[in-house]
Amino acid sequence: VSDNPFDPSQWQSVDGFDLTDITYHRHVVDGVRQPTVRVAFDRPEVRNAFRPHTVDELYRVLDHARMSSDVGVVLLTGNGPSPKDGGWAFCSGGDQRIRGRSGYQYASGETAETVDPARAGRLHILEVQRLIRFMPKPVICLVNGWAAGGGHSLHAVCDLTLASREHAKFKQTDADVGSFDGGYGSAYLAKQVGQKFAREIFFLGRPYTAEQMHAMGAVNAVVDHAELETVALQWASEINGKSPQAIRMLKYAFNLTDDGLVGQQLFAGEATRLAYMTDEAVEGRDAFLEKRDPDWSSFPRYF
């Protein structure tokens, strides 16, 4: 019996995408599309390390999920196992073979010799972090193997994390390769596990099991590997059974105090949308269009 948590019979590829480094699926039950999508790194032979092209695809599909009004939850994971050694990985961070002095470089192949010198290096995995953070729907990270370096930071920025009991390994390798995630990957991680554990994770760069990360507070649940995506779909189903507006407001409320004016703007934007839905707001709009004074007399000043 396969222990691969991915069951292709439950998923359907999302049309309109020509992807090489990422897969993008919609959950289906009896042929009916469900409000959960699955986004996965698809470079298992290199522990799902990302290159600029990978990040381009990842951003595109996540943004599509963000703008799909019938999608409520995003699952983010990595495909596997590796065809080389059978190992599992969620994401092992940036592909160091094509890292240049200005960031990760576009390349036609897999090595430094194939880098395109005319294109600037990129660090746009940080844009993906912000997209996950600002997306008005929960993103659940499924750590089915290694979450290292930039992959560790991606797990940290997701709303929830489920981890494989047998194969999940967490390791923050940034300082080993002269890199550092000075934003969500570190400071927000410290909000989850506390300052002492966060500094240990970064300063020592040791590997941690799913159980250890759960004890620290960075993993929501430790799940048998073969059941990882089944459990994730159950969590997604429970979330999708809640009010979409409430889920949006809750995510932005949790984010607000750490995200400054941007966090305030996102929360306030959803509050504005709620206001637009009221009779009071309709009266204000109609009075403007009809060139008359608004009549607020029927609207109480609540306290």
Tell me what each language-model feature is:
Residues R43-P44, K242, K291:
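Short loop-to-helix capping motifs
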Residues V1-K84:
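Conserved CoA-thioester-binding segment of acyl-CoA-metabolizing enzymes
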Residues V39, R43, E57-L58, L76, ...:
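Terminal peptide-recognition signature
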Residues I201, A253, T257, E270-Y276:
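Helix-loop "lid/cap" segments that line or gate small-molecule binding pockets
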Residues L204, M216, M249-L256, A287, ...:
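Short acidic/histidine-centered micro-motifs embedded in hydrophobic/aromatic stretches
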Residues R130-P244, T278, D286:
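Crotonase-fold acyl-CoA enzyme core
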Residues V14, V46, G78-V128, G178:
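Glycine- (often His-adjacent) and acidic-residue-rich active-site loop
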Residues R33, D85, A163-A168, V219-L266, ...:
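C-terminal long alpha-helix characteristic of the crotonase
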